[in-house]
């Protein structure tokens, strides 16, 4: 009997040892082959590249190339904002803080990006204010930052991807102009229509709207509008602009009041958090990303501060990262952000565990060949094998996410490229080649 038990125990140990050795040898084989792909790539030798590949089953790195070096992440930063939002925000986003006092409804912004946002289309705050029979007053002053994040390119103030940051954003903080006929455009919000004027000195070229840097004066050339024309320009934010846009949208007057938010202020909840996160991730929406950090800050106290939110998140939720991050904004527009590829991998692993539902998580992320910013990066398919986040600035192009292999494995990867002068398409193609190789072979 004793011999039989000893024999069984030995067989179990031998089996476990065999599995361990097999697992190690498999990872070593993958590391060797992936390393060879990097070594033999002439393209990758021309710029700074960091890469990390992580085995989720064994909870260990398979292959690293300068994975402990710092890179400008661009919109890979949104993965940090995504994780922070999962940790700090309730399932329904705080849309407004308010009190009712005598004949007045006084409200404060929470930074909520969903107020009539063109993709989320949440109307919770709108309907709440519209249905009130009290006088409406907006109380500004919660936001402690500037209208642009640290390290942003101010030259980009007039581009759709860089709306201003404010405590109560409305309609993406942008003006949308669209084609009506060759001589007319439709302007939303309509309150900005009187701010548009024709620049009679420009009589050639395409119809394009521009805005003055410090004011809400919009100009367009004296040329015909072409069918299909659709443009978004950020508007210049201010408390006065906020109440004018609100009043025009609600078709009722909204006043300003100087009042600090009291402890007994109530919270109105609005859009579903996960819906907002998906609308941030798929198109890489900078506006949503920045304001999500303000909503996180709203959970901490009276002041809306990107810096305060990031400091809190770093202290309470990111201590597991192997490298200290330099994180300054929610979107990645700033070149001051610096993350390592291995940090990106461990963050994605924590996101995976936090959501605890791969189908749900992957639905919120761009999918290679199918959706979001990865739709055109990989061949068109209904069965994507890559789910992740891209990040691009001049000389910067990154991908971090999950790769599903033909052998049924799911690996986490981060592929960061900085300091290149060649076309971004060539850098992207090399990333796609390597990630596809991993999918096909492992």
Question: For the regions a protein language model found, what residue spans apply to each?
Answer:
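Small-residue-rich helix-loop
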Residues: 62-64, 293-442
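Solvent-exposed, polar/charged alpha-helical surfaces in well-ordered, non-transmembrane soluble domains
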Residues: 32, 36, 80-83, 166, ...
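Conserved serine DD-peptidase/penicillin-binding transpeptidase domain
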Residues: 87-323, 441
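Beta-lactamase-like hydrolase cores
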Residues: 25-70, 89-92, 130-134
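C-terminal motif of bacterial Sec signal peptides marking the signal peptidase cleavage site
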Residues: 21-23
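Residue-level preference for non-acidic, small/hydrophobic
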Residues: 59, 78-82, 168, 246, ...
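Active/ligand-binding-proximal structured segments within catalytic/core domains
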Residues: 71-85
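Bacterial N-terminal signal peptides that target proteins for export
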Residues: 2-11
């Amino acid at each position: 009997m004793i011999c039989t038990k000893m024999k069984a125990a030995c067989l179990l140990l031998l089996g476990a040892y065999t599995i361990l050795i097999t697992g190690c040898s498999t990872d070593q084989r993958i590391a060797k082959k992936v390393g060879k792909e990097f070594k033999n790539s002439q393209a990758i030798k021309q710029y700074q590249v960091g890469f990390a590949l992580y085995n989720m089953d064994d909870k260990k790195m398979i292959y690293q190339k300068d994975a402990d070096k710092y890179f400008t992440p661009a919109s890979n930063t949104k993965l940090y904002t995504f994780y922070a939002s999962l940790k700090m925000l309730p399932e329904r986003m705080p849309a407004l803080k308010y009190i009712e006092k005598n004949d007045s409804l006084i409200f404060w912004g929470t930074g909520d990006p969903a107020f009539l946002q063109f993709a989320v289309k949440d109307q919770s705050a709108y309907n709440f204010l519209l249905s009130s029979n009290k006088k409406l007053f907006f109380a500004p002053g919660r936001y402690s930052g500037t209208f642009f994040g640290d390290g942003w390119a101010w030259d980009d103030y007039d581009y759709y991807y860089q709306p201003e940051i404010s405590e109560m954003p409305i309609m993406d903080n942008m003006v949308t102009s669209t084609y009506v006929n060759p001589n007319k455009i439709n302007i939303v919000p309509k309150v900005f229509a009187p701010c548009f004027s024709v620049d009679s000195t420009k009589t050639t070229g395409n119809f394009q709207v521009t805005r003055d840097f410090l004011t809400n004066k919009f100009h367009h050339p004296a040329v015909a509008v072409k069918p299909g024309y659709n443009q978004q320009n950020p508007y210049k934010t201010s408390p006065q602009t906020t109440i004018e846009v609100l009043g025009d949208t609600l078709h009722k007057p909204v006043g300003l009041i100087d009042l600090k938010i009291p402890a007994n202020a109530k919270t109105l909840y609005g859009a579903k958090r996960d819906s907002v996160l998906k609308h941030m991730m798929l198109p890489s929406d900078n506006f949503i990303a920045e304001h999500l950090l303000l909503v996180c800050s709203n959970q901490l106290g009276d002041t809306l501060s990107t810096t305060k939110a990031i400091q809190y998140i770093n202290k309470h939720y990111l201590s597991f990262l192997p490298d200290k991050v330099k994180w300054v904004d929610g979107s990645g527009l700033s070149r001051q952000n610096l993350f390592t590829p291995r940090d990106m991998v461990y963050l994605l692993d924590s996101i995976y565990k936090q959501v605890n539902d791969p189908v749900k998580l992957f639905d919120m992320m761009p999918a290679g060949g199918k959706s979001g910013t990865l739709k055109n990066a990989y061949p068109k398919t209904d069965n994507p094998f890559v789910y992740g986040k891209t990040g691009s600035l001049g000389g910067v192009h990154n991908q971090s996410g999950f790769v599903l292999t033909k052998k049924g494995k799911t690996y986490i990867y981060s592929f960061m490229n900085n300091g290149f002068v060649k076309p971004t398409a060539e850098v992207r193609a090399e990333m796609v080649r390597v990630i596809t190789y991993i999918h096909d072979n492992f």
